[in-house]
């Protein structure tokens, strides 16, 4: 499941960089309880790893973050507007993926890439969604100058605001 691969990614990053803290935003108290239960069942991950679960807006967690790992969707747009480097990972059921391959012809699936019409953030799909790939991509942001990416996010944000003003 994607929950396990995200947790495996945290473990892989922690092995290489024990100074990095991890934040998991919970949409509400019910989700908080679910996340805590999942982590407890996962070899008590929360006590072994520097994981902090927050409630409230995901936006606050994004702003507090250096890099973000997320599944595709509107959260990618929010991360872009917060000007945070991100890795977008998405895994569909095999049959759903086969159907989508026939129907969906856009070159990208992450909203920032679709808006830019360019691969500005890493997209991992299906078999590429694994802890090794995700941890390497995320750690890469810590070792890079991300100013060009942030500038691109700023341009896209401006374009969105201008387009919104025209309607």
Positions of the model-derived regions?
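Nucleotide-activated sugar donor-binding and catalytic core shared by glycosyltransferases
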Residues: 2-167
């Amino acid at each position: 499941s994607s929950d396990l691969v995200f947790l495996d990614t945290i473990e892989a990053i922690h092995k290489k960089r024990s100074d990095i803290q991890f934040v998991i935003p919970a949409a509400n108290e019910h989700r908080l309880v679910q996340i805590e239960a999942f982590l407890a069942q996962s070899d008590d991950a929360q006590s072994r790893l520097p994981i902090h679960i927050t409630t409230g807006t995901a936006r606050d967690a994004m702003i507090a973050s250096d890099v973000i790992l997320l599944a595709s969707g509107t959260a990618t747009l929010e991360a872009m507007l917060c000007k945070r480097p991100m890795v977008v990972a998405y895994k569909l059921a095999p049959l759903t993926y086969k159907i989508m391959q026939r129907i969906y012809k856009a070159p990208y699936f992450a909203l920032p890439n679709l808006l830019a019409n360019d691969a500005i953030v890493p997209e991992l799909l299906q078999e590429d969604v694994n802890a090794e790939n995700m941890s390497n991509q995320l750690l890469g942001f810590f070792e890079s100058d991300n100013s060009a990416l942030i500038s691109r996010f700023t341009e896209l944000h401006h374009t969105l605001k201008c387009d919104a003003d025209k309607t």
